[in-house]
Amino acid sequence: MSSALRGKRVVNTRALHQACQLDLLLERRGAVPLSYPCIAIEPPEDFGPLDQALRNLVRGSFTWVAFSSANAAHAIATRLETLGMKRTLPAGVLIAAVGPATARAVLDSFGRSPRIIPGRHDGTALAFAMPIKPGETVLAPGSDIARSELTEILGEKGARVTSIVAFRTAAGSGGVDMPLKLRERGVDAITFSSPSAVEGFFERLSRSGLDVASLVRIPVACIGDTTRETAERFGLAAHSASSQSLDGMLDLLEWLFVPVGSGGTAWS
């Protein structure tokens, strides 16, 4: 069956090392991926606090590990290997993950599935979903720009939380000439899988002098309500998928382009 995305030029804003997965999914639906990395994942400037937290983790000092992103899981696994430790989590530690993609990263990285995955995939929902007992210890690895809701709510529930920078979210670079594509109306849709990608998109465009008001004509598909809300704050006509995954985001985008009425689409 022909896809409504066939021939559509879709911007992929994921970090360069993660972009190929979405590119392949777009191509399978007949779309034309336009790579425009809006974030880059880099190591912490100081590994000291992370390394100490990992030594404590291996010694069994934590009741829980709460992963707020797939990047956090990959960063922890990589650093354990670098330190000469086993790429595993202690058998007794409980694992929570913010969503299905993060849960898959945990399984791939450590061979274990999280005990807790909330229905809504953000830090607030993760914190409320975790059955914390007062005094339990939680390791919360994340980005240098991670939101504070996870650690704040866990603290209010009585947990002793160690929030640690496992990676840095930096500005993206490379990809297509986005200002030119937009001026020539060479973009049919934009995708965002994180709030930081939205912010990075506008940071990159701000250097070009492009009138971002022209973006309101372009449909935007997001993973997660937090990402959608961030896009809306920038004035975009954003939508979030009911299934918070890459496939779910593309299902949403495809629905937006399904023909309806006399020559229109669900989007237009």
At which residue positions do the language-model features occur?
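Conserved beta-alpha
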Residues: 1-268
